[in-house]
Amino acid sequence: ESVADLEESDTRRVPKIPLHLVIAGCPSLKTFYQGDIRHWHQLFDAACHVRPAMGISVSAWEEAQRCMGPEQASIVVVAMLERFSDIRSPGGYLRALTSKAAAGEFSCGPMVMALIGRRSAA
């Protein structure tokens, strides 16, 4: 890979959605993670904390981080937590989204906006 390829992949991985919107769309996270979340690394810590309880394997989590970047993978996991009762196989769902991300066909922004839309409609 060239430097340009690496820079392009890095910018593609930076979440295009503000952290405060992620937190607003995923209030269930506060039930399972007591720490403050003001920075992306804190969201990553929270996702690492809830991942095992959701039944997501280490290998699925690591692959998601590799394909999406740690921030977007974290967003996906905490968004999945919000809809946990609707997801039959969280590990399988994360792997499917990881495959889409690897093909350039997935962005976590619409996932979070859908959660916010559900909350405002409720």
Located regions from the model:
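Electrostatic interaction modules used in gene-expression and signaling proteins
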Residues: E1-A122
